[in-house]
Each structure stands twice: as structure tokens, then as C-alpha cells.
């Protein structure tokens, strides 16, 4: 409690001084070293990172936080249920795709919505939203429109936009979450590092990626996976363990998402495991009251995306998600991107509200307002992926 109070005081004083970022140094946070192997060996180049350290860190996240994401399936089928060539008054083509995945005589169906710009002669880059909110946010008829998934605005910029609902793979409820994809992998339920809800949603995003690889209208080399809040946690994990995603976008993902757990602002490991015991693997609960025993922190998750592109978005009034901790995760992941000769963010400290910053492969903004996914956020995401990745 003393540590929590001290960090909160530092954060408050920093805000009063006109800066959103606390002055806590990396050494004060006692973060695990991202460029030191489990055997204590320093990682000095990209080859060492890819061969040695990246697999270690991925395994640590599987074993201690998200659980393993099973890869094996008996079969997967893609069925185009509907195709409308004059969607959005002729500005887009709509596809509704049914993705059926089979294993152990069980199956799960993911219903994918996909809008593609009509005025393009080449495969389109696509944003994939992991939607954990109401399905009315992704209304395919466009009778209902939502900034949470602003399909018209994205199409107007020349990008495709897609979404699936998380309930197709795992219902977000502690009593029924296992009734989806986990029927295909019942062995996960009894394992300390078994996949739970967040891992299941990431698994679903990868099955959508399987489909994108088959659709000639989509540029499979330019797929951005997007998630807000708990969906942001899933997007980050999907991007970490599935390197086919070219860009990973986290919006207000907070604890066990983009925010450093050791920053001790807002939601804690104990909070999240108490309120949402079905989200993460059982092993994560070991760290409820012993955070410094956790061999990872979220800067290491973001580092797993290197050399691909990562964007983190925060909201000024969303203290529960710890905007400063989210920014610091990006900053402390930069040494890994440096191994690939990629430039750091052009901001040593958290930027001012509504002043986005980006390099070729890293981006961040702090939006005015509450915990939400808005058109302002989407506009910044589109600006970001328009930057050539070097």
C-alpha cells in the first residue's frame, strides 16, 4: 500500500506541473530487462533477439499471463454468406464470411464482416477490430453507425475494415466463457498456462487472418489488428504471437494490455484477476500480491512486435487504464526496435493531450476524454499506417 500511495503521489505532482508523465525511472519500477536472456546474456543484435530472446519472452507470456494459444485444427472452412457490391451507396463492397473451425469433432463459427473500398484496383490494407461491445457497433446494413467502428470514414481513406464479435469464440462471462472455442481444446481448461478468454479472442483474430490470406481483395501483408480495452489486450496478444499482423493497435488497453503492471497506477493484477477470473491463465493469479515475482512486464509484450508496427492510444480521463504506464511501455520497448535500426518515438516523455507522435514503426497519442474508442482515435490509426514502414 505504501508503494501504491507513493507512485500515486508522484503521478499527481507530475500532472500538477503540467506533465502527464511521472518522473519515475526505469530502475525505480524494477522492470525485467527486455534485452537480457533468461541465462543473463546480453542481447546485442537483431539476430540474437529473433533466435534467443523473443522465443523466451513469448514463452514467459504464455506461461504466466495469457496462456498458450493452440495452433492445431482438423480443418477450417470459409463460406461467403453474402456479397453486396453497392454497399455504402456504391462506395464499398460488403462481404459477410462464415469461418468454421473444426477439431476433435467439435466446431466453432466466426462471423466476419468486411467492407472493401469499391474504387481500388489492387488489394486493400485492412483494419480488423476485435469487437467486445454490442454488435450494433458493427451494423453491416449501416442503418446504425458508431464511432467505435467508423466504416464509412475508413473506406473513404482507402482502407478496408473488418470486425468479428468476441462471443463467437468466447463469451465474456466467468460461467460460460468455455462454451466457445475451448470446446475444441478442453485440455486447456486444466492447465496452469491454459488459454482463457483473452487468449481465445486472439486465437479468433488469427483465424480471421487465415481468411485474409485467401481473399484476393485484401493485402495480407498490410493487416492491422485493433482492439479497445479488453479487446486491446487481445489485439496485443494476437500481434505478439502471430507475426502475420503487420500492425498492432491498442486503445485504452490498460492492465495486462499496454500499461506497465509495475507502474502501480489504476487497475492492478489483483483487481483484474478478481473481477475477471476468466480472462487470463490460472498462473497469472500467482502474482496478485507479488508483482515483482512476475518475470515479464508489458514493455516486453510490445517488444515482441518488433520490427513490425505498434500504436498505443490512451485517454486523458482514463486513469484506470494508466495512460502514463501505457506510454512508458512503448518507450521501454524501444531498445528492441533499435536492434532493427528503427527510430524511437520523437518524444522523450508523454506528449500533450491531442498531440500524436509517431516514428515509422511506433505511434502514440493521448486523446482528450474518457475510456472509449472514437473517430479521433481511428483517424490517428489511419495516419499512422500511412507512414511507410522501413
What is each PLM-predicted segment?
Residues 20-111, 386-389:
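N-terminal targeting or regulatory segments adjacent to alpha/beta-hydrolase or S9 domains
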Residues 250-301, 326-349, 356:
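Mobile cap/lid helix-loop segments that gate and shape the active-site cleft of serine hydrolases
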Residues 1-23:
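Bacterial Sec-dependent N-terminal signal peptides
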Residues 306-321, 367-368:
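Conserved strand-to-loop "acid loop" that flanks and positions the catalytic carboxylate
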Residues 367, 375-390:
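Catalytic active-site module of serine/aspartate enzymes centered on a nucleophile-bearing elbow/loop
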Residues 134, 138-140, 206-267, 290:
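Primarily recognizes the serine-hydrolase "nucleophile elbow" in alpha/beta-hydrolase
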Residues 87-141:
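Glycine-rich active-site/cofactor-binding loop and its immediate structural neighborhood
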Residues 122, 126-215, 261-262:
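Cap/lid segment of the alpha/beta-hydrolase catalytic domain
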